[in-house]
Amino acid sequence: DGIYAWSEFIPTGGQYGNSHGSYWWGDYGNTEIEFTPVYGMFGAYGGHAGISNYVGSDWQNEGNYSFDLQAYNVTGGHSGTNFNTYFGYLDESGYGMMESLPPFYFWDGEARVIDHMWVTNTTYVYNQAHSAGFGSDYVISDESTFKIVAYGYESDDDTEPTVAEFYLLNVGQNFVTEWTKWDLSVLGKVTRVEFNCVGSDDMYGSYGMSVPGYFAYDDVAVQFPGETVFR
């Protein structure tokens, strides 16, 4: 309560998202998007990382959970200093980090088109997607992939969401290493969007997905009727 500047959410004592807890936020008077972390096996942190301005490229030394708020190989946000980091995934192993996927939603219940957002990898994912532990013998190959899947819901009763995908790691060991535009207009009008992180089969071991379900994002652009510029 009482926090009005995005930068006030950023921890000053380290780059570990869990050290400052999870929180909800709302972009009121602009995109009208609200976000609430979900609760699961690991508490509130099961579905949130946090707002950040931490960046770096030393993926071998800073590619662990202590740097989970760090965007990889960029100099700041897509436009400006700050950006957001997302954590959350569900799989069929029973070891997923939460019981439901953390969503964006329009707080007023109006369905709108989210035109696009800008995304990139975190240093943590870049490291772990090369070679991860966590109950797995995974080592990157030319067939390894890691993607974000977005599910768009037009209403609370919608049981058949529209889907969009974005590959943070594509075949041929092709990583995203800069802010990249992700077209979400294919989802159509939505009241909420849920995100999941999904790896190729080789990334799964005894405890589910061995690569952490993170990505960094910025500048979520929303279409409003009668306006020619995205908010």
Language-model features: locations:
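N-terminal targeting leaders for non-cytosolic proteins
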Residues: 1-102, 109
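Short catalytic/ligand-binding loop motif for oxyanion handling, primarily in non-cytosolic enzymes
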Residues: 122-127, 201-204
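Terminal, low-complexity interaction segments
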Residues: 145-230
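Short edge beta-strand/loop segments characteristic of extracellular beta-sandwich folds
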Residues: 118-120, 137
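Short coil-to-beta strand junction motifs in C2/discoidin
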Residues: 128-148
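Extended extracellular/luminal ectodomain segments enriched in beta-structured repeat modules
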Residues: 109-116, 189-190
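Short acidic, Gly/Pro-enriched loop/turn segments at secondary-structure junctions
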Residues: 125-128, 228-230
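Short secondary-structure capping micro-motifs at structural edges
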Residues: 99-107, 131-138
